[in-house]
Amino acid sequence: AIDALRTTVREDYSNEHLDWAADSRLIMLTAHRRENLGEPLRHMFRAIRKIVDEIPDIKVIYPIHMNPVVRQTANEILGNDERIRIIEPLDVLDFHNFLARSYLILTDSGGIQEEAPSLGKPVLVMRDTTERPEGIKAGTLKLVGTNEQTIYEQFKLLLEDKSEYEKMSKASNPYGDGFASKRIGDILEGV
C-alpha cells in the first residue's frame, strides 16, 4: 500500500472538491466501522461538527461509506454545513490524492493508519483499539476513541498547536518509505 502511494499521488492532480477546499485546511474524514454504528458514530460526528462551527479555516471532505445507517447519521449531523462535503466513495487514485492534500485525517479505518503517515499527515484514530500499535508508538497516530469530548479536544489541539501538529506530521513512519518493491526488484535482478 505504501509503495502504491508513489505511483498514485500526482502533483498535477485536480478535482472539484479539492478546488472547493483550496482556501482552507482540508480535513479528510472516514468513518464506517460496524462497532462504531449508533451512538459512537454520533459522538464522532458531533465533535467534528463542533470544531467546524468554531474554526473558520477548515473544510471537511467525507467520502461516505455505502452503509445506509452511516449515511443517515452523517446527513443528519454533518449534512447541512457549507464547510462539510459528504461525497460518494473515491477510487484509490482519487483517495490517495485527497489524503496527500489534506491537513490531517480523522478515521476509524485500518489501512489509512498506514497510508497517511507516509504522506506526513497526522491521524486521529476514532476507535478504542488499533491493529497498528507501531503507529501509536511512533507518534504518527493518536488513538482518541469515540468519546465526543476527547475527539473534540484532540482535533482542536492539532488545529491550534503547531508544535503538536508537527510532532505527529514529522514523526518517523513505521510503515516504510514506499521503496520496498524497488528493493525487491533490485535483489531479484541481481540473482
Regions found by a protein language model. Give the residues of each.
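Nucleotide-activated sugar donor-binding and catalytic core shared by glycosyltransferases
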Residues: 1-191
